[in-house]
Design a protein with these regions (language model features):
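Active-site-proximal specificity loops/subdomain of glycosyltransferases
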Residues: 1-14
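Short beta-strand-to-loop acidic/aromatic patch adjacent to the donor-nucleotide binding site
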Residues: 11-25
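Conserved donor-nucleotide/metal-binding helix-loop-beta segment in metal-dependent transferases, i.e.
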Residues: 25-53, 57
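A recurrent flexible, glycine/aromatic-enriched loop bordering the glycosyltransferase active site
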Residues: 57-69, 80-102
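Catalytic core of nucleotide-sugar-dependent glycosyltransferases
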Residues: 69-79, 156
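Conserved beta strand-loop-helix elements of the APE1-like EEP
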Residues: 100-110
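A short, conserved alpha-helix in the catalytic core of glycosyltransferases
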Residues: 109, 118-135
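Active-site donor/metal-binding and catalytic loop motifs
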Residues: 139-155
Length: 156
């Protein structure tokens, strides 16, 4: 992913890079434009866009997004209790869906990011964005109802 972002951002015609999870069942042709428009309209001054969405399964109407609901949210809340509200922790807590794999950024930002290439991509990338960009240059975009291919959760 890091090589892709740098390769595409070196293209003189490319102004932004947008990436989407490959397992989206409800992908809409509107998603790319929703993600990149805040970056292309210079009046907004946005450098990074992170998606959020409702994680309701279309198969069984069950709420998905277990990793965020059952791990990341409680982990950030526990860290807040242990170390207090620091600026970085508040930043991470400000994202409606921090593990969303859909994000977009400007060519200039892409050239300065150290993009993680393994587990932890989403939080690692948010950390890099925090290191490189003022929070006023970050936006979240609602992509509406979103359904991924799901893995069954079984307790053995």
């Amino acid at each position: 992913m890091g090589r892709l972002a740098r390769h595409r951002s070196c293209d003189e015609k490319s102004e932004v890079v947008a990436l989407f999870d490959a397992d989206i069942r409800t992908f809409s042709p509107l998603y790319p434009s929703r993600m990149i428009l805040p970056l292309l309209d210079e009046s907004y001054g946005i450098s990074y866009v992170k998606a959020f969405y409702s994680r309701l399964s279309l198969e069984n109407n069950q709420l998905q997004g277990r990793a965020t609901r059952l791990f990341v949210g409680p982990l950030l809340a526990s860290l807040e209790q242990l170390v207090g509200k620091g600026p970085f922790l508040q930043y991470l807590q400000s994202f409606r869906y921090p593990l969303a794999g859909e994000f977009a950024f400007t060519k200039d930002l892409a050239m300065n990011l150290r993009i993680p290439c393994d587990w932890g991509l989403e939080i690692g990338l948010l950390s890099e964005v925090y290191r490189n960009v003022r929070t006023s240059k970050i936006a979240q975009v609602d992509l509406g109802l979103f359904d991924h291919k799901h893995k069954n959760f079984m307790i053995k």
